[in-house]
A protein has these predicted regions:
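Conserved, structured core segments of small domains
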Residues: 1-104
Length: 104
């Protein structure tokens, strides 16, 4: 089952994000078998990180919640809100995906 995890940063979270970045990426690498898509949410300037969005494939909501609870940014208190929702894959067009992380 697919779950989207939408997490908004605290307004004062830049230092928390910076100091836990390596642990965050290591955690995602250890869970690459369930991670379909992930990335930072950005402000309109395209630079400021304002949160994170992950789409994972796990058998149950409980497993999605466990994955989220153990994610280093969340454990460090970065997020002011976390929303987990089950989703159904509707449209799927990998050819439309950007070629770079910057969206180009």
């Amino acid at each position: 089952m697919l779950y989207i995890i939408y997490q908004e940063d605290r307004d004062d979270g830049a230092e928390i994000r910076a100091s836990n970045r390596d642990e965050h990426f290591a955690y995602l690498a250890r869970h690459q078998d369930i991670l379909l898509l992930g990335g930072a949410l950005l402000g309109d300037d395209g630079v400021k990180r304002t949160g994170s969005c992950l789409i994972i494939n796990v058998p149950s909501r409980e497993q999605a919640e466990e994955f989220s609870r153990n994610e280093p940014f969340r454990k460090a208190g970065l997020f002011k809100s976390v929303k987990i929702a089950r989703m159904r894959r509707g449209q799927w067009n990998p050819a439309a995906a950007p070629k770079t992380a910057e969206g180009n």
